[in-house]
């Protein structure tokens, strides 16, 4: 389609019978598969709920946030990510409330609006972004959210079938057969959709199947007879695809997750999994490293045996710090640091490692909830500011030593998403400035074996991985091509191009 006047785009949408069915990675695979056919492709998800976010170009030359899944999908599609690909991002802050990000920018005025009213106010932003992407591309690969057939939410659900209808999309419905009940999930979802929405379903996908696919017979044929929709693919269980799962933390057990290494020779890295953990996807490369074992630790006991302890990002630093103390993880961290064993804090984790959190503007809650003593492992004071700092960061390690000396001189590109601003405590001996950005600003500090950084993306840098572990991981291009090869093998021959033919062209 490239090289001539572009006809209206066609859309392929990935729906799921449940959360965690495999929508995100399949949408990513489709982005690369269609891009390899010479088509101009863009991803889209009307609304994402996640604390995994990336910094991308927004409107007016400003930077904004989108969900990490759409960021990776854009890279798979070989296009520059932008805020229209995920026009609404909800970042949970507590059990009942979320920060609302619209076209990359925080909209505080929408946070307290009731859900149904807010959905109607957000839909025009999502629709405009979708239509703009369809006007600029040959194919738009759309990811749904949860299930499209939640009958109590259906009237206000703009992320699934309302988006599908606006795009005139050919829809795939994915079910996780490893959980059991896949045929019932597919049939029930089909039956609960109104007739006009059912008509958009073009194929079923059975994901994460173990064993001989012939054991499924005659299920797909009976499902076709009942619904008129064919099963286009049975995808085998595949844990090694290399992409982070959007809800991957919740799928992990409490034990050490071993990559390619020998258990006895492995470096054990424990990541503290507090309730409002954010940007956990940046740890995905560690799962691929030979000789590294990863664990999500939710208690002091689960830190036992760790060589490194990592405090990741947090969407609510003071709240997660209180939780950390309730679990007695603070004492375990102090012992670990006193033994000169590596402790790493990233963004919110860095803030926790300091002397104090100060919240004069109530960013983390009213009535002083955001004010708290820190862990005292770095001589820093962090103040939370109302304006969120978003930026892409080119940084260089310069003042690192001791346990982190192997990073000296290493450069990497990361990103920052934060309300906190940290400075050295004036009454305490200064920590070494460990990391500076291209402007020379300090964005990382070290004291003894404790290192705190504001830049996310550390473990996504091949230079950093080589310095820390003497290792390389598969590059993203290899991961994306592997995904495309996988679906090419397991979808019915010609099915993916037929989906485009079945999709109605978008409006000019």
From Swiss-Prot:
Pfam families, per database record: CbiA, GATase_3
Domain GATase cobBQ-type: start-end pairs: 266-464
Gene Ontology annotations of biological process type: cobalamin biosynthetic process
Keyword DNA-binding: no
This protein's pathway: Cofactor biosynthesis; adenosylcobalamin biosynthesis
Signal peptide annotation: none
Membership in a protein family: Belongs to the CobB/CobQ family. CobQ subfamily.
Main function: Catalyzes amidations at positions B, D, E, and G on adenosylcobyrinic A,C-diamide. NH(2) groups are provided by glutamine, and one molecule of ATP is hydrogenolyzed for each amidation.
Protein name: Cobyric acid synthase
Gene name, Swiss-Prot/TrEMBL: cobQ
